[in-house]
Amino acid sequence: ILIGYKDKKWKYNVTACSSSYSLGDMITVGLTTDSNAVDNIKEYGEFTVNVPCQQILSKVEIAGFHSGQNKIGMADMTYDPAKYIDAPIMDECILSLECKVESTSEYGKYTNFVASIKRRVVCENLLDEEGNMKYIQFNPIYFMGDDNKRVYRYFNEASKNHGENMGCSSDEDEYNPLCG
């Protein structure tokens, strides 16, 4: 993901982040403590989470390097100001979240921000006519790695409905005791 934030030197900036999870209206992101992003997010208490697709991977990599530089300019990215916080919503991304920091914790060389989600912005072509997410078309970048190797993975079109691996059906007439 790309974390957008207010930057005291460059107005707005971004950094790449591979550590996050969300539950309901809360999200946690983890970043290296000794970074420009952490310094600015601690100061301003706000950030955006922007989910890129594989078509902009070169821009994501620029955002993952060059700490303290104008990475939005270096990657030739565009943005709109967020509606409820002072941080950038990256135009090239397929999903964005406006986040307000609720707590910060440091563990070793990492800082974790727990934030409340104030607004969600989803690319219109990912929504059906009722405003529901078209998950099959959601194609984010998945970054994984360790000290040995780091790689990018991508989602494909294969999917299964929740419960399908246990033999559960969405057909209400079929009863399976495993499905509850």
Predicted features, each with a name:
Residues 1-180:
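Basic, polyanion-binding surface patches
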